[in-house]
Amino acid sequence: MATRARATILLLLAAVLFAAAAAASGEDRRRETSLRRCLQRCEQDRPPYERARCVQECKDQQQQQQERRREHGGHDDDRRDRDRRGEGSSEEEDEGRERGSRRRPYVFGRRSFRQVVRSDQGSVRLLPPFHQASSLLRGIKNYRVAVLEANPRSFVMPTHTDAHCICYVAQGEGVVAIIENGEKWSYAIRQGDVFVAPAGTINYLANTDGRRKLIVTKILHTISVPGQIQFFFAPGGRNPESFLSSFSKGVQRAAFKISEEKLEKLLGKQDKGVIIRASEEQVRELRRHASEGGHGPHWPLPPFGESSRGPFNILEQRPRFANRHGRLYEADARSFHDLAEHDIRVAVVNITAGSMNAPFYNTRSVKVAYVLDGEGEAEIVCPHLSRGGRGGESEERRRERGKGKWREEEEEEEEQQKGQEEEEEEQVGQGYETIRARLSRGTVFVVPSGHPIVVTSSRDSTLQIVCFDVHANNNERMYLAGMNSVLKKLDPQAKELAFAASAREVDELLNAQQESAFLAGPEKSGRRGEESEDEDRRRRRSHRGRGDEAVETLLRMAAAAV
């Protein structure tokens, strides 16, 4: 008995030791994963001059976590430390965000942005690559969304990037300078302006307003590494670091023909950051050198018309659609020459409080929308999420779950191809998932081509959205309801077969809505419907009353005749 008891104890002890080792191993894996993610964010989202500091912060944070665990014997939440650095959140929050990503892979809240530039005078926030959030967004993996905010009378350092930048001025006014093909073009910009800074061109800007922030929303088309953007600063010093200082001293002396001492003094002096304060006189001189041109029509394109350089004010154009429920302004390659080679259309949508846009989809373009102001709700109809529920799962989470390490690019391609083949075997028309999302200032949402979308403004505020439509050439906007509904074009026989109803009944359905593009929202239309029903009831009662009076009159006349 004693021997059996001793054996049982030894087995239990071995089991405990094994469990402890497994737990420690699991904890080590979690720490390794957390550190790897932190380092990856440094590489992808931080400019070169901040990367070394970011890597050191990741290592320091990892060491602090280990010390806290040793001291307290538990797993402390390090969210405060990470938020202070703008580097994300804890493992538990990452998992929660993954679950949210699977439910709503096309919607990104304000917290999804990461600050890649921070100073007392402003910031630049960058949305992570779309394909990292969901495999459904692989089609726009080369695009990123960024928001620049510059305080009054601030200056953004000259830089160039390896991405084409299509910009919309959401608020304020300033000047922008772009050096391209050996020429410097300097323009005044204001709210409603669209301008383009091609990849590799040196550009800088200043907020010339003494009271308001300058806010510029951007979509960046990366051309080197898909989804990754690098900022290059030639002028600079220690912060931002000039890339000129990375050349050898001999190359620097030969290139500039000045002494090493002067070079070190010049390239090591600036340390105030990417966005700095400018004096009133400096701002006035920058404004004086800026051209006021470029806000008029940019069509026809050369050689049939004269090219007009500079920004294009979208809000000064005639709306594409306009009624009491909303307005749609657009700038495309036909109206703005600078967009011609980028296959992007820029649109600004204003939806009146309590109204909505008519349901529609784009035939070719992918809509990347940023909420400028107001609140509302978006409904996106998606067929992918109804097939097994894994369509919106993060690439990173799938890689970790599959092998516990990063897969090679070839394995990713094989997995994607396999998934596509499985999807092709699915039966079509077997259900859709409706993605519903609350919208507020700073929300980004993506609408893939072919996906129907409705955006409703809250009853308390007008909703204003800027949209960057990627792959805009030859795109058509197909409205599904309203006077311009594409369904009205169906043959009568097609209507009968498709709806299993008579063509007359289908026409009654399609012709009931007498407005186009922008409609009364659910609450407004609901109230109008109730008012209409009340009016019908009153009318019927009124008709009944007059009929009763007529009957009584006829009876009296008949009685008198008798």
UniProtKB/Swiss-Prot annotation:
It is found in: Secreted. Residues 106-264, 312-507 form the Cupin type-1 domain. Keywords: Allergen, Glycoprotein, Secreted, Seed storage protein, Signal, Storage protein. Residues 409-427 have a biased composition (Acidic residues). It comes from Oryza sativa subsp. japonica. PANTHER family: 63 KDA GLOBULIN-LIKE PROTEIN (PTHR31189:SF79), OS03G0336100 PROTEIN-RELATED (PTHR31189). GO terms for cellular component: extracellular region. GO terms for molecular function: IgE binding; nutrient reservoir activity. Glycans are attached at residue 350. Residues 63-103, 383-430, 516-550 are annotated as: Disordered. InterPro entries: Cupin_1 (IPR006045), RmlC-like_jellyroll (IPR014710), RmlC_Cupin_sf (IPR011051), Seed_Storage-Functional (IPR050253). Residues 1-23 form the signal peptide. Belongs to the 7S seed storage protein family. Seed storage protein. Its main location: secreted. The lineage of its organism: Eukaryota, Viridiplantae, Streptophyta, Embryophyta, Tracheophyta. The keyword RNA-binding does not apply. Residues 63-88, 390-408 have a biased composition (Basic and acidic residues). This is 63 kDa globulin-like protein.
